[in-house]
Structures are given as structure tokens and as C-alpha cells.
Amino acid sequence: MWLGVVTLFPEMFRAVTDFGVTGRAVSNGLLELQTWNPRDFTHDKHRTVDDRPYGGGPGMLMMVQPLRDAIHAAKVAAGDKAKVIYLSPQGRKLTQQGVEELAKSERLILVCGRYEGIDERIIQTEVDEEWSIGDYVLSGGELPAMTLIDSVSRLVPGVLGKQASAEQDSFSDGLLDCPHYTRPESLDGIDVPAVLLSGNHENIRRWRLQQSLGRTLLRRPELFENLALTDEQTKLLAEFVNTAQAGE
């Protein structure tokens, strides 16, 4: 997968290229990331990249010409086949479903805003989609871009050691993940659930699914609004509720 990033702080993306899962993906040639800094497209000695907004008000906007030229350079490198995404609090909220949609793209260009944002005409003429990682304000689009890159790259074939790791993640099936345990079998008097030590794969699968359903009900019940439960899921959830009520 090829990713282009337009950013005033390309150094920040070493967190993607040099570390962890994404770093290994880059090293193995499964993920390619290039950056374009609008400062490199300025024409004044101060390398100015901000400008005053029409109508006044506090703050500055990213200057149109350097930003637009940087986006154009990224498009040329992508062969004009890439989808251009602007990271914005006004965009579509990123969910696992959205991540799966974006992961189908072979090439993405991510535009990271700074200051008070970017000129609306840039969004109208250069941007294909706007995406947000949540209803809160950050200093720029770099952290949202890295969040998007990390989540999308996990779905690129070969990036994870086992594709099942991605399939079992929270939200991959619309539910929260089940609890996980490793050694030792007993920690501060709390034992690993016996079913996980049983070796019975079907019982383990059912337990994990039931825990996933129950945890979602307790912590994020609104997620069920978009789910159509199977007969098995309905039965397991009912058992979870009955057990929880009996233990009260």
C-alpha cells in the first residue's frame, strides 16, 4: 500500500516508518510512505506557510499556494490514482467499517491541516473525502493521519503475523474484543478462566464470543443498534445476562 502525506512536520511520521507494526511493514516493502512539506514549495526567504483569513478573526490559515503545490506533487507521485483525504473534525468519523473501506485503496494521500485549517476552496477542488478521528480538537492533522495509517495498515495482507489478529480486534465484527490472558495462570488470586485452559477449541470460541457480546452490552450498548445478531449470538448474550443477574 502506498501512502502520501502532506504535512508541515514530516519528522513526526518516523513514528510510523521506524517503529512497531507499521515500521516492519515499511521494512518488508508492504507499506510505502512519502511526505511532502508545503514549506518546500514556498517562494519567500521566510518559507511562509500561513496567511490571514478573510473576514478577520483569531488565528491563521495554511497558505493556499504552498499547500496546493504540495498536494499536486503528491498526486503526481501517486500517478493521479490516489484518493485525497483531509483530516478534519468536520469529516466522517473513522470507524472500523471506514478503515476497512479505506484499506481497499491501493494509494491514499493524507492532507494534514495546521493553524485554524485550510482554505475551503482547497477542500472543494483537491480533496476527495474528509475524515475525523473524533469530536475533539487537536493541534494538527498529523496524529489523526498516523491513527488512520496504523489502523488501515493492519488490514494490508502480510502486515500482521496472523491475519486472525486483525479479525479478532475490537470492532472488526462490530463488537468489542473479549478479555485476554497470558501466563501466569494465577495472578494476585485471580485465575485464568478454566475454559481457556481446556483445549476445547469450540468451547473457547463460544466463550470468547459470549464475552465479546457481554462486554459490548456493558460498555458500548449503542453498538448493538447497527448489528443484526445471529441466533447463536442472541442465545449467548441471553446466557451472559442471566449469569450476570444471578451473580448480583
From Swiss-Prot:
Report the EC code(s) recorded for this entry. 2.1.1.228
Q: Which InterPro entries match?
A: Alpha/beta_knot_MTases, tRNA_m1G_MeTrfase_C_sf, tRNA_m1G_MeTrfase_TrmD, tRNA_m1G_MTases_N, tRNA_MeTrfase_TRMD/TRM10
Name the source's superkingdom. Answer: Bacteria
- Which GO MF term does the entry hold, naming one? tRNA (guanine(37)-N1)-methyltransferase activity
UniProt keyword Magnesium present:
no
The alphabetical list of record keywords is: Cytoplasm, Methyltransferase, S-adenosyl-L-methionine, Transferase, tRNA processing
Name where it's found: Cytoplasm
| Annotated SUPFAM superfamilies | alpha/beta knot
Enzyme class, UniProt record, top EC level: transferase
Residue positions binding S-adenosyl-L-methionine:
113, 133-138
The principal location of this protein is cytoplasm
Please list the GO biological process terms of this entry: tRNA N1-guanine methylation
Q: Which reaction does it catalyse?
A: guanosine(37) in tRNA + S-adenosyl-L-methionine = N(1)-methylguanosine(37) in tRNA + S-adenosyl-L-homocysteine + H(+)
The record ties this protein, via Pfam families, to: tRNA_m1G_MT
- GO-annotated cellular components: cytosol
What the protein does comes down to:
Specifically methylates guanosine-37 in various tRNAs.
Q: Which NCBIfam families does this one have?
A: PRK00026.1, trmD
Subunit-structure text:
Homodimer.
The family assignment reads:
Belongs to the RNA methyltransferase TrmD family.
User: Which named protein is this?
Assistant: tRNA (guanine-N(1)-)-methyltransferase
The record lists the organism as Shewanella loihica (strain ATCC BAA-1088 / PV-4)
